[in-house]
Amino acid sequence: MTIAVDRAARNSHSGFLEAGISLIAKRGIDNITVADISKASGFTRATFYSYFGDLDGLYAEIWMLYGRLWLEALAKDDLPYKSEADQLRCSAVLEIFIASKRKPAVLEVVTPTVSNWWNDSVSENKADQARLAWIVAGNIGIAISKHLAPSITNVKEIIALLRQMPSDPAVLEAMGLAPTPKTAPLQAVLRSLEVPEQTDEERIKTSTIEVVASAGVADASMTRIARNLQVTTGSVYPRFKNVSEIIGEAFNWGQKTIVEENTAAYATTNSNPDSYAAIIVGANSESRKVWRDFRLEMYLASRVRESLSKAMIPGLVEADTLLATFARKNRLPERHIDQIVGLMHALGLGFPALQNAGVDVQAIEHRIPTRYLVSVMNILKSSGVAASEFDHRIAARSVVPVIGNGDRSTTSAAS
């Protein structure tokens, strides 16, 4: 009798986990209920509550089972997408990871997992830290945005180049990639979207961004947006028909504004590879936290909301155009422009997700991978070698340093 009861308990527990994973992956983490999971699993809600307490308890347990494995797979470019069950599991863990920033009971298990994984995976070597952060951030960005831009998977070719980035300080020095100890990383000073001279419509869009950033798309409403502005709902409705319209317009406006400011900030620095590193550090500063969280929420929700995906496309197309123009001005190889733009988008999603989980993204020595990639791009451009055929061990023998003595640009993105 005891054996039968134990077996039934195991079956019901695993049944809830399997049903939860499937529903999170297919509907999105904000669009399921305990009743949905109970129905899909065939077990009662009372039994669910006895195991997990609430939905966040289920999410936490799924993360504890698969979170570390998922992070390790991201680092190896080896996400197990071979079976439908694997695909559902990866999608569910991704949703839990992104949404955990606003779910304290989930974040309290996500953060230690990420911390232990990070500490076990890196040494004091700055290049090793940067390589791991860029590869994992890039793969997170690809995973959360491929439904909007399937071609972003082409960024994996650039990630493969990053995997070849050397760690040996002597090799880095010979390639002109090692920042001198006396030079601290730059941080671009980037504004938040909220500035004093905003129009009424821009203030409403800013309020929308703040609400979605803190609560998610599913919990955003016209009432909440108005309340955040300290105005009545009637002040919002004349300008926007419904909450879906305002969320889409807020994304497109914010995306264009942020990209324009980032590219302008690049121009005010030395306009060399270190300048992009400075933008990464600035983009992950406190002034941009609301925008970062909003953007993550938009990608998360649009994965299962086709109407939201369609609303976001104009802003993404315009951002891609601006970034591609920026890349061409810096004379990066034409055949890799789309991949470079994709990498910028992917890192813009992956780094904030890692930072929310406790990785100090601003402390990463981003100058090493930015110098390395620009150096590699120059080699590919001059040699005609495909990125897939690149070997840094051969290239290192003849490479012109990206940064010269005193960290002055000798071969930059604009050369």
Question: Which ranges hold each PLM region?
Answer:
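Amphipathic alpha-helical segments enriched in hydrophobic/aromatic and basic residues
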Residues: I24, T33-V34, L55-Y66, V212-A215, ...
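Hydrophobic/aromatic-rich alpha-helical bundle segments in the mid-to-C-terminal region
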Residues: L107, E124-P185, V189-L193, S309, ...
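Short, structured motif recognition centered on aromatic/hydrophobic residues
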Residues: I29-I32, R89-A99, V136, I247, ...
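Amphipathic alpha-helical packing segments from all-alpha helical-bundle domains
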Residues: R102-A130, R288-K289, D293, E306-R331, ...
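Basic, helix-initiating cap at the start of DNA-binding domains
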Residues: M1-R27, V34-A40, G57, A178-A215, ...
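Hydrophobic alpha-helical connector segments
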Residues: E61, E72-A92, N262-R292
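Short hydrophobic/aromatic patch on the recognition helix
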Residues: S41-F52, L229-F240
